[in-house]
Amino acid sequence: MNLNSIPAFDDNYIWVLNDEAGRCLIVDPGDAEPVLNAIAANNWQPEAIFLTHHHHDHVGGVKELVKKFPQIVVYGPQETQDKGTTRVVKDGEIAFVLGHEFSVIATPGHTLGHICYFSKPYLFCGDTLFSGGCGRLFEGTPSQMYQSLKKLSALPDDTLVCCAHEYTLSNMKFALSILPHDLSINDYYRKVKELRAKNQITLPVILKNERQINVFLRTEDIDLINVINEETLLQQPEERFAWLRSKKDRF
């Protein structure tokens, strides 16, 4: 399987997995045009689309792609049923695509119906987990997002985290504002800054590394707890997550 990223809009990535025969899976096609161009350039045969949630920058290209390739099966959560989804999937179900099993993981928070797809090593996590950050809480609660991130963080170390946006640099600036002396965060920030200066993608990331540099995955880390305790005493990791998310919203 080959993993490809297609830039869209200002900072979106549309992920495509293709096999040796050229069959492909498209994830969150917010815009059809760059996908159609990539399909033509690579001679791919689209078989399926995965949708993670209902926001327009993730679903906007579905209908045009299905019109061009009517054989495509569109998988998505209930909230995408009016966005072109033909096969609604929910937590714990399996999507069989390109000869692989993709587990569906419910990750409410960014939206209430948000889901992710995992087939080792690939995790397509939409707007739930970003490198160095997590999605805004447009519909869900901090507790829901905390539990969703906990699920994703428990996946195997070598998981390739395929996020839907290039937010890494701004996320790492926030991480540095919280833990300015953390060596892992400083090292990763420098690496990301260099990549973005060359207009290069920072994704996908390896989950084992992400756990070290993403403050939203470190709510039980003593260094982070000490920082938060300087401002307020919070006993539960869910509360510390909510504190971080609130800080990030105002950053």
From Swiss-Prot:
SMART domains, per database record: Lactamase_B
Sites where the protein binds Zn(2+) 1: 53, 55, 110, 127
Organism: Escherichia coli O17:K52:H18 (strain UMN026 / ExPEC)
Classification via InterPro entries: Clx_II_MBL (IPR035680), Glyoxalase_II_hydrolase (IPR050110), HAGH_C (IPR032282), Hydroxyacylglutathione_Hdrlase (IPR017782), Metallo-B-lactamas (IPR001279), RibonucZ/Hydroxyglut_hydro (IPR036866)
A GO biological-process term: methylglyoxal catabolic process to D-lactate via S-lactoyl-glutathione
Broadest EC class assigned to this enzyme: hydrolase
EC identifiers of the protein: 3.1.2.6
Origin: domain of life: Bacteria
Bound cofactor: record note: Binds 2 Zn(2+) ions per subunit.
Name the UniProt record assigns to this protein: Hydroxyacylglutathione hydrolase
Reactions this protein catalyses: an S-(2-hydroxyacyl)glutathione + H2O = a 2-hydroxy carboxylate + glutathione + H(+)
CDD domains linked to this entry: hydroxyacylglutathione_hydrolase_MBL-fold (cd07723)
Pfam families named among the record's database cross-references: HAGH_C, Lactamase_B
Binding site for Zn(2+) 2: 57-58, 127, 165
